């Protein structure tokens, strides 16, 4: 029995993953990840790092982060508590959707995860207080390979659902994309 539905999005490579939730009087069981099922769906990368975040304030935006090659990473993002609007921006140089973004709603209730391949910037906005996310990464964090773009970059024109209540100084200071930005190949 399949425990996941892999749903396509308007941007090639971005996938919304719906986890099957089995419930009874005791509660529920939801398979979070299965390498065999992901491989059968064409996702064949090993998880090497897992991060867990808490965002306390509704309206907070985190992002937009990525890692440059040769440390580019795929992220599998899930919400364990609360609700977030999760966004990925296509930075792949040769992509027909270069600089386009796609957002999805992730929550503990909807049992969805966002599979974001190499070559995308990632960020989110907390839609409730005390949001907890878990990220599965296919590459370890490498500070020298870290990249970011400003979540309010007018060239991206991301439509955040709420007014931005909080953003770290670091995220707020990420650069706007220069007109000559051509992306990169993961």
Which stretches of residues belong to each language-model region?
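Short beta-strand His + acidic residue motifs that chelate non-heme Fe in jelly-roll/DSBH
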Residues: 114, 122-127
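Compact nucleic-acid interaction/catalytic patches
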Residues: 124, 133-134
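Non-catalytic, conserved peripheral segments adjacent to functional cores
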Residues: 1-112, 130, 137, 142-186
């Amino acid at each position: 029995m399949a425990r996941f539905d892999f749903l396509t999005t308007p941007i090639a490579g971005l996938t919304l993953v719906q986890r099957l939730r089995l419930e009874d009087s005791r509660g529920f069981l939801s398979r979070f990840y299965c390498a065999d099922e992901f491989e059968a769906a064409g996702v064949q990368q090993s998880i090497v790092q897992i991060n867990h975040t808490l965002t306390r304030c509704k309206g907070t935006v985190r992002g937009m982060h990525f890692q440059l090659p040769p440390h580019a990473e795929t992220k599998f993002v899930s919400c364990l508590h609360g609700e977030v609007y999760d966004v990925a921006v296509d930075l792949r140089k040769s992509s027909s959707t270069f600089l386009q973004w796609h957002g999805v709603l992730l929550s503990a209730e909807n049992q969805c995860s966002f599979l974001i391949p190499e070559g995308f910037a990632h960020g989110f906005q907390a839609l409730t207080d005390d949001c907890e996310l878990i990220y599965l990464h296919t590459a370890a964090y490498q500070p020298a390979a870290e990249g970011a773009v400003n979540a309010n970059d007018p060239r991206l024109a991301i439509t955040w659902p709420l007014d931005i209540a909080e953003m770290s100084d670091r995220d707020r200071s990420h650069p706007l994309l220069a007109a000559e930005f051509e992306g990169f190949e993961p």
